[in-house]
C-alpha cells in the first residue's frame, strides 16, 4: 500500500512540476530552425505529425490536436475530443487554431508546417520545429519534451535506454563487418502506388540506419542517376547485395503490385545478386519510414539480423 501511495504521489509531483514550472520561469531551447524558443505553457499541445504526438506522449504529455497518422499509423490512445487535423502534408489550420493550443510541435521538413509559422506566431502561439531521423535526434527531442513534462523517468526509460540498446547493436555490426573483406551494399527503394524512387542515406530513417550499420547505399555519393531516375543501368553496375523496399501510403497491395511490375518490366532486374539470392525485403513502414521513436532499438535489431545473415 505504501508503494502504491508513493507512486501516486510521485505522479502528482511530476504533473505539478512540469508545465507549472514553465508557466513561471519558461523553458528555453534551440529548435531545428536554430530559433531560440521559450515555452511558457504546455497545457494544450498540438503535434503536427503523428510521430511527434507519439514522442510527446512517450514523454508523459497529452495532445489536443494532431495529424491523422497518429490514429492511422501509430494507433495512439487518444481521447475522443482530440482534433484530427487531417493529413500531415495539408493540415487544417482553422481546426488547429480552434483547438486552442498553447504549444505546437512542428516538423522542419514539412513545408505546410513551415508556412503556418507566421500565422501562429501572430496569434501568440509558441511553435517549435524538430527534425528526427536518427536515435540521437529522437533522444534530443525526448530530452526537451521530458524537461517540459517533468518526467525524467520517461527520458531514461523511453530515451536513454532505447539509444543504449541501439549502440549495442551498432557495436555488434562494427565488430561483424570488421571481419569481412567487403561491406554489404543495398538499394533502398521508397515505393507508393504511383511511384518508386531510390533514396540515399541522408535525412531519412532507413537510410541513416543503413549507414549507421556500415551498409553501402548504392544511391549515395556520385550515383545521382540512381537517385534521380532509378537508372537500372546504374543499379546493375553496383549490383547490390540487398534491396530494401519501404511502403509510402496505406495501400500495401498496390505498392506490391507496382514493385512487381517494375521488376518484371525488364529481365535485367533478375540478374542482380539481391534478386538471385532472395535478398529483396519489404520492410515495416512503421519502423523504417515513419519515426520508430521508442522502437528504434527494435528497428536496428531487425535490420541487423537481415544484413548479418549475408556470408
Predicted regions and their residues:
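Structured C-terminal subdomain patch of bacterial secreted/periplasmic proteins
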Residues: 139-148, 153-156, 160, 242-311
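Bacterial Sec-exported substrate-binding components of ABC uptake systems
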Residues: 4-5, 19-51, 152-187, 247, ...
Amino acid at each position: 500500500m505504501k508503494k502504491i501511495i508513493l507512486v501516486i504521489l510521485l505522479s502528482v509531483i511530476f504533473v505539478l512540476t512540469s508545465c507549472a514550472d514553465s508557466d513561471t520561469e519558461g523553458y528555453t531551447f534551440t529548435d531545428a530552425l536554430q530559433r531560440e524558443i521559450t515555452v511558457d505553457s504546455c497545457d494544450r499541445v498540438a503535434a503536427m505529425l503523428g510521430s511527434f504526438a507519439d514522442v510527446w506522449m512517450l514523454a508523459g504529455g497529452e495532445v489536443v490536436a494532431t495529424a491523422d497518422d497518429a490514429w492511422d499509423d501509430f494507433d495512439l490512445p487518444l481521447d475522443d475530443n482530440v482534433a484530427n487535423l487531417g493529413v500531415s502534408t495539408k493540415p487544417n489550420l482553422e481546426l488547429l487554431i480552434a483547438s486552442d493550443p498553447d504549444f505546437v510541435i512542428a516538423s522542419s521538413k514539412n513545408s505546410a508546417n513551415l508556412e503556418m509559422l507566421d500565422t501562429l506566431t501572430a496569434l501568440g502561439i509558441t511553435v517549435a520545429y524538430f527534425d528526427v531521423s536518427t536515435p540521437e535526434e529522437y533522444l534530443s527531442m525526448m530530452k526537451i519534451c521530458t524537461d517540459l513534462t517533468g518526467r525524467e523517468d520517461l527520458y531514461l526509460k523511453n530515451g536513454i535506454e532505447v539509444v543504449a540498446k541501439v549502440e549495442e547493436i551498432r557495436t555488434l555490426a562494427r565488430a561483424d563487418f570488421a571481419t569481412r573483406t567487403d561491406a554489404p551494399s543495398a538499394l533502398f527503394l521508397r515505393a507508393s502506388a504511383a511511384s518508386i524512387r531510390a533514396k540515399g542515406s541522408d535525412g531519412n530513417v532507413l537510410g541513416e540506419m543503413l549507414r549507421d550499420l556500415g551498409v553501402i547505399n548504392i544511391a549515395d555519393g556520385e550515383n545521382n542517376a540512381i537517385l534521380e531516375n532509378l537508372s537500372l543501368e546504374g543499379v546493375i553496375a553496383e549490383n547490390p547485395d540487398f534491396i530494401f523496399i519501404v511502403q509510402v501510403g496505406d495501400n500495401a497491395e498496390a505498392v506490391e503490385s507496382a514493385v512487381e511490375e517494375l521488376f518484371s518490366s525488364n529481365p535485367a532486374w533478375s540478374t542482380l545478386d539481391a534478386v538471385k539470392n532472395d535478398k529483396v525485403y519489404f520492410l515495416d513502414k512503421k519502423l523504417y519510414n515513419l519515426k520508430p521513436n521508442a522502437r528504434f532499438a527494435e528497428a536496428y535489431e531487425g535490420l541487423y539480423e537481415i544484413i548479418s545473415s549475408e556470408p
